[in-house]
Amino acid sequence: MSKTITIADDVYYELVKMKGNKSFSELLRELIGKKKKGNLDILMIAFGTMSEEEVKEFKKKIKEVEEWINSWTPVS
């Protein structure tokens, strides 16, 4: 049985980029299953949909956040 859902255009276009040759149902099943496993799996899905430039920028941002966290001084 199929159901109709309404989503925002921007969400639709992100799902289209992520799904590749899969059906929307397959993609959503995968995302729901990954949610149960953790955020790292979700990031791995995202990396598969990013261009090389987007991956580089994402890694750069992660490094900046890590450096920022490492700069914190412990409070006694």
From Swiss-Prot:
It comes from the Archaea. Pfam families: VAPB_antitox. Signal peptide: none annotated. The keyword Nucleus does not apply. Keywords: Toxin-antitoxin system. Belongs to the UPF0330 family. Possibly the antitoxin component of a type II toxin-antitoxin (TA) system. Its cognate toxin is VapC2 (Potential). This is Putative antitoxin VapB2. It comes from Pyrococcus abyssi (strain GE5 / Orsay).
